[in-house]
């Protein structure tokens, strides 16, 4: 069976319709992300759509979140990094633009530390959480 890298428009439309019916405001964008994450596996699409329609955050469904221009891997049990948290990164950079060390305690996914390290360049990064 040939592998299709691009889902058919009807598949995208069907996924978007299901997501929209479940209350997802950006259903088309979410459908694109789910279809890309599923990589052509119809079973994976079905599982992801079911999980998203049940209310699981999109980032946990696809396994990553965009934060500070980077893809941060996420999984259940870790808070999903949110765009509004990027404000914290901006403030830290404004207060210490030449920092040589970053300490990210209770780091969760490590998004804040990773974003700071990426922005600062050569930095000594220490990130820790309870798990």
Where do the model's predicted regions map?
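Conserved AdoMet
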Residues: 28-94
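Aromatic-enriched hydrophobic runs in primary sequence
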Residues: 21-23, 30-31, 41, 46, ...
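A short N-terminal interaction module
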Residues: 2-46
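Conserved SAM/SAH cofactor-binding pocket of Class I
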Residues: 84-131
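A residue-level detector for conformationally permissive "hinge/kink" positions
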Residues: 15, 47, 61, 100-102
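Secondary-structure boundary/capping residues
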Residues: 27-28, 61, 101, 125
